[in-house]
């Protein structure tokens, strides 16, 4: 299948598959996934029907933050393979009509990057101004900004007596985008990969690149209001876009930290001057009571619907968003919002339908398409994620939370929940590796695995395959406006998508009991066609505006004008 480089809007009907390479497939016995492992599974991804693969970082890195600390933008981490392996992946994916999107981190580099190593301890280094250095204030840090990973965001360079800024780990030094030389380096890096044939880029925390230049302390927060969606961020993105993205026809998705709808309308504006689309995470905080992640709490269903409505109506005709539940930082959605025991298959399908029928570009995270669950670890020794082990130390040893309570919280909230190895088959270690996996495989792999899913036409896999097909076949999914039909209903999430010719209804029961609802009379359900549902005998129930839905049932109905 040939792919034209400048088919500008291919991503509007596309579905993108996210691969976290470390946990996807090991081609040998080292216990960590690699590029050759990805190549070996391309036929599986072709069968699923995805249009593109987004790879989390595979660059040279000390791996302090899972590769988001890049020490060489022009090299592949030997843990994942060689540049030759990468070129093979690119060629074989393209042959199957699958595009490749690379994850690029340009807010910061690893402190092992040669730019930083040259800058460290030498105020006269040509690379000193590639980073953000400040003198102490009153013998201490330049301001009170906090790192996203805890603690102060400044680290002292003893040799020069100045501090450098790190919004993430101290091993991740923020780049100084005010320096035009930095922006030229970024253009060169992106051009290098685009020249190879890489089709697009996911830009990590890209809305943090412009800092308020007086670097004020924050008397009411952690400092984020002074660097989030900062003063020159749109100018910088337009500069990079014009120089590189527009030249190559790259698809671009910006990860937006703590952003607003208004900024995202501009980042992803339909004139294409900045980015193709944006990721935001507001809907994944509905189980953070008062913004607190590390608690066991039910999710706020009404708030979830309100957030979807805000972003769907706000981006319609103005911008473009990514649609997703899962990634390498979030727990498995079927464990989080569904029922991963009694109704695992039903709830996995319902949750998929409820985001895939919205406007935007859906992202499927590895294993989501087979209904993989959180692993339910019971010992802290099973965890590898630094955020999780740090929080265990703080909450158990400092705050007095019991071991049992903290294990229950981690079992719900840890990032390792989504990083367990991909479950390929029912053989040892789920067919992920011939060695010992870097992170323990979830115990349910003999039941939940790709081989079993592909063999069962009623599996979660084929439901995802159908959702991916529908986006290409039904125009209203791409261009229809969005309306939440039952915003106050405590159990049902039901919305309409409408254009001049079609009305699509997506009706979802988010709970484990039978629930009824009445849809507005203006929708003529007697004319509706049942496009897809997750129960075998839903067709007869379609014709009435009075709907009765079984546990975790979803119905996707189409009315042609």
Enumerate the predicted regions with their spans.
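Short acidic (Asp/Glu) and glycine-rich catalytic loops that position anionic groups and cofactors
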Residues: 219-220, 286-288, 329-332, 440-448
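Hydrophobic residues within beta-strands of alpha/beta enzymes
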Residues: 53, 201-203
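Acidic/aromatic-lined carbohydrate-recognition and catalytic surfaces
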Residues: 2-191, 195, 208-262, 270, ...
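Carbohydrate-interacting/catalytic domains
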Residues: 1-60, 87, 91-93, 361-364, ...
């Amino acid at each position: 299948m040939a792919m034209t480089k400048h088919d500008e809007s291919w991503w509007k009907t596309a579905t993108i598959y996210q691969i976290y390479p470390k946990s996807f497939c090991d081609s040998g016995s080292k216990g960590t996934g690699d590029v050759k492992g990805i190549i070996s599974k391309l036929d599986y991804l072709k069968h699923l029907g995805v249009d593109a693969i987004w790879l989390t970082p595979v660059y040279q890195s000390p791996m302090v933050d899972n590769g988001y600390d890049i020490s060489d933008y022009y090299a592949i981490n030997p843990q994942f393979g060689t540049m030759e392996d990468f070129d093979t992946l690119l060629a074989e994916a393209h042959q199957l009509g699958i595009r490749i999107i690379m994850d690029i981190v340009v807010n910061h580099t690893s402190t092992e990057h040669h730019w930083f190593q040259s800058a460290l301890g030498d105020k006269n280094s040509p690379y000193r101004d590639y980073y953000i250095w400040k003198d102490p204030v009153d013998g201490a840090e330049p301001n009170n900004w906090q790192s996203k990973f805890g603690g102060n965001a400044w680290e002292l360079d003893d040799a020069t007596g100045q501090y450098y800024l790190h919004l993430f780990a101290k091993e991740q030094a923020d780049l100084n985008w005010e320096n035009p030389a930095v922006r030229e380096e970024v253009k060169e890096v992106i051009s290098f990969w685009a020249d190879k044939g890489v089709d697009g880029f996911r830009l990590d925390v890209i809305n943090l690149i412009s800092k308020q230049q007086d670097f004020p302390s924050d008397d009411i927060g952690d400092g984020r209001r002074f660097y989030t969606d900062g003063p020159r961020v749109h100018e910088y993105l337009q500069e990079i876009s014009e120089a590189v993205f527009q030249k190559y026809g790259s698809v671009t998705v910006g990860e937006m930290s703590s952003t607003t709808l208004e900024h995202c309308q501009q980042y992803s504006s339909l004139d294409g001057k900045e980015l193709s689309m944006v990721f935001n995470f507001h809907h994944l905080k509905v189980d953070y009571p008062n913004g607190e992640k590390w608690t066991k709490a039910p999710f706020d269903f009404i708030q979830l619907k309100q957030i979807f409505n805000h972003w769907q109506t706000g981006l319609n005709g103005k911008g473009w968003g990514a649609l997703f539940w899962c990634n390498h930082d979030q727990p498995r959605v079927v464990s989080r919002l569904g029922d991963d025991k009694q109704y695992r298959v039903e709830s996995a399908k319902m949750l998929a339908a409820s985001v895939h029928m919205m406007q935007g570009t859906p992202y499927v995270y590895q294993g989501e398409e087979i209904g993989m669950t959180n692993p339910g670890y019971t010992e802290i020794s099973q965890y590898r994620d630094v955020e999780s082990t740090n929080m265990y130390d703080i909450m158990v040893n400092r705050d007095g939370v019991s071991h049992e309570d903290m294990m229950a919280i981690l079992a719900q909230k840890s990032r390792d929940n989504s990083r367990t190895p991909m479950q390929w088959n029912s053989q040892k270690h789920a067919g992920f590796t011939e060695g010992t996996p870097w992170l323990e495989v979830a115990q349910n792999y003999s039941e939940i695995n790709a081989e079993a899913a592909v063999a069962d036409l009623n599996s979660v896999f084929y439901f995802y395959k159908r959702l991916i097909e529908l986006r290409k076949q039904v125009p209203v999914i791409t261009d229809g406006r969005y309306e939440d039909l039952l915003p106050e209903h405590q159990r049902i999430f039901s919305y309409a998508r409408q254009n001049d010719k079609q009305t699509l209804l997506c009706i979802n029961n988010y709970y484990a009991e039978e629930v009824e609802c009445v849809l507005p009379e203006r929708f003529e359900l007697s004319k509706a066609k049942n496009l897809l549902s997750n129960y075998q005998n839903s067709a007869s129930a379609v014709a009435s505006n009075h709907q009765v839905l079984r546990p975790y049932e979803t119905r996707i109905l189409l009315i042609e004008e």
